[in-house]
Amino acid sequence: MKIYGKNVALEALKGNKKIHKIYLSNKFKDEEILSLIERKKISTKLLDNRELDKMCKGLHQGIILEVEDIKTYSFDEIIPNITTEYPLIVILDHLEDPHNLGAIVRSSEAFGVDAIIIPNDRSVQITSTVVKTSVGTIEKVKIVNVPNINNAIRKLKDLGYWIVGTDMEGTNYTEIDYKTKIGLVIGNEGKGISKVTADNCDYIAKIPMKGTVNSLNASVACGIFLSEINRSRGI
């Protein structure tokens, strides 16, 4: 896959990611990145910005990397083997916007989420836009692909997890006890959590709001919940 942008490039170059080739603007000047490229002896090709623009739709900042695909995992590879005291899993109910997924990945890395579960079908998957929006943090978060999120939720419950769904109606999110194994469900941008998924949740929680807006962007809501979970756990 192709990833782009200075921060993403820096994360990839500092890590162990296999980089096949780098396309650079002939005006690229970032000395730290250039030094890492030279040190790692990675094949590069100089192009003008118009050629780089044709290669990607986003803001590339003069650098595009051709890399191996981001690794994803199955449920059984990751979830049963989590050893943190209070595991925290984010479950995405058919999100569609790659910017939302990237922002959720970034927040998840910041707040110490153990894994993110996304369904295989009818859901955004990992793209160059997701990687760019996550500012490279996607390499530090376990992404778990599942055929069916409700089957995954039932398996989480069998492992002792409490499932918290997010919605405009429900218990105040500050009143829930998060000092246990938690699976946090974030709904689709337009439809929210499906009825079947909501029925599988132990709690439905809301973020109280005072303004005229009655809902938040999925990634914003996720960040607020993750912050509250950490606060309630004394982190």
Give the residues covered by each predicted segment:
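Short, glycine/polar-rich helix-capping loops at beta-to-alpha or helix-loop-helix junctions
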Residues: 29, 123-129, 191-197
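N-terminal positively charged helical leader segments and presequences
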Residues: 1-80
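Short beta->alpha connector loops at strand-helix junctions that form conserved
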Residues: 48, 93, 119-120, 141, ...
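Active-site/ligand-binding-proximal alpha/beta "capping" segment
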Residues: 164-217
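RNA substrate-binding interface of SAM-dependent RNA methyltransferases
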Residues: 42, 82-171
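A short acidic, often aromatic-flanked loop/helix-cap motif at beta-alpha or helix-coil junctions
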Residues: 50-55, 72-73, 149-153, 171-173, ...
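Structured adenosyl-cofactor binding patch, chiefly the S-adenosyl-L-methionine
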Residues: 10, 15-16, 132-135, 198-235
